[in-house]
Amino acid sequence: MDLYAVWGNPITQSKSPLIQRQLAAQTHQTMEYIAKLGNLDSFEQQLLAFFEEGAKGCNITSPFKERAYQLADEYSQRAKLAEACNTLKKLDDGKLYADNTDGIGLVTDLERLNWLRPNQHVLILGAGGATKGVLLPLLQAQQNIVLANRTFSKTKELAERFQPYGNIQAVSMDSIPLQTYDVVINATSAGLSGGTAPVDVEILKLGLAFYDMQYAKGTDTPFIALCKSLGLTNVSDGFGMLVAQAAHSFHLWRGVMPDFVAVYEQLK
């Protein structure tokens, strides 16, 4: 049976095995998908051994996306620009192909929410790895992006890298332009420690819809809770993005595009 896995550290919390099994059942694909704990010191050796033993592909989650990218032989454009991958596929010639389906997963989920139209103004909070993975698909969807981060130099470097692909402006967190934002996306990891991005609530009040790339089972993420406390109710966490990026990885491996909304509805 074709073997796939998700690699991360920690990994016990991962929903990927559950999601991928649902996608396989829906599309009548016979495959095994397991969670693998990556060793922080010897991840590269583990991953290469996994493929040498016959595995067909895998997902990569924190903290290994950049390290896995370095092991690949060929890359999609979106993985190359992000310098990180969340998906690897073993090609027929034995080479490893890296892709990054995070951004197309986000775009697909924004479409599900009916929050994506051309020429919108999108504010992204945070300029870390999560942001790098989503910028190209958002720009390809003709979104005008304001990218805000506490460290301006990091934001500026990222904006310059993606400028050839669309309209993107770098600002520091305390100099975000006062204008209406069709979608505000939280791409910071502050929620993992119970905090929120250091953004002025007056800026948030200018938003029309709010998306947190994090998700929390059975409760609101800190960012969603903050939005609701301000009376901003057009909100979504990132669980739909998680299912959608999984569906795009599945499509790369199996050549079949699942109905991600049906699986999202089953699992949410």
Swiss-Prot record:
Oligomer status and interactors: Homodimer.
Catalytic activity: shikimate + NADP(+) = 3-dehydroshikimate + NADPH + H(+)
Active site: K65 (proton acceptor)
Keywords linked to the UniProt accession: Amino-acid biosynthesis, Aromatic amino acid biosynthesis, NADP, Oxidoreductase
UniProt protein name: Shikimate dehydrogenase (NADP(+))
Xref: InterPro entries: Aminoacid_DH-like_N_sf, NAD(P)-bd_dom_sf, SDH_C, Shikimate_DH, Shikimate_DH-bd_N, Shikimate_DH_fam, Shikm_DH/Glu-tRNA_Rdtase
Gene (UniProt): aroE
Function: Involved in the biosynthesis of the chorismate, which leads to the biosynthesis of aromatic amino acids. Catalyzes the reversible NADPH linked reduction of 3-dehydroshikimate (DHSA) to yield shikimate (SA).
Binding site for NADP(+): G126, A127, G128, G129, A130, N149, R150, T151, F152, S153, K154, M213, G238
Organism: Haemophilus influenzae (strain 86-028NP)
Pfam families the record matches: SDH_C, Shikimate_DH, Shikimate_dh_N
Keyword NADP (UniProt): yes
Gene Ontology molecular function: NADP binding; shikimate 3-dehydrogenase (NADP+) activity
